[in-house]
Amino acid sequence: MATINANFNKLASGYLFPEIARRTALWQKRNPGVAVMRLGIGNTTEALPPAVQRAMKEKIDKLGDRRTYTGYGDEQGDTYLREAMVEYYKRWGVTLEPTEFFISDGAKSDAANIQQIFGPDNIVAVQDPAYPVYVDSNVVGGRSGSYNSERAQYDGFVYLTTSEEGDFIPTPPTGKVDLIYLCNPNNPTGAVSNHQEVKAFVDYAIANKAVIIYD
């Protein structure tokens, strides 16, 4: 008999952003006429620039002609795009190879999917607060205990708690962890760690053979 992944049952009542939308709608219903400044999902507000419009149209026109149709793209993303990114980073004195890039649909999917290559016994440290997909994806991956409603945290995770007094900058764990999720600049605080603050995590990761997943 097919069974479900029981780790889904550990997830808190709802994903953060739909829950924010639900509560906002409820509050607006009770407080009609009051404007709400939304600081939830960072939706886009500006139109595509002309250069992007032209490039997309040119690509669509090529795909609409059998003589220039290209079919599926490369598994890692179009080669010409990865080569262009190599040239871009040369401006900053950074030498990379096209094979070091992977073109995807965004950081959210990658942050959720990358945990699948690691074993379920890895100890996870996550910056707190931070983008919720880091925690939720590892809960589903079986790396957490149950949700602790009193602490509003999952048992089994190491939370790198930050505060306004510390400018919302995290510090490396004091104990042993295997995976470290860092969001810099941070979502939602906007705090930006400097070179030395990031280096402290790199030094920790090297010393403890940990992996940093840096968003």
Model-inferred region functions:
Residues 32, 208-209:
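Residues at helix C-cap/C′ positions in short coil/turn segments immediately following an alpha-helix
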Residues 213:
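Generic enzyme active-site microenvironment
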Residues 3-6, 10-105, 113:
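N-terminal small-domain helix-loop-helix segment of the aminotransferase-like
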Residues 1-3, 181:
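Short, basic/glycine-rich phosphate-binding loops at helix/coil junctions
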Residues 65-208:
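Conserved core of the PLP fold type I
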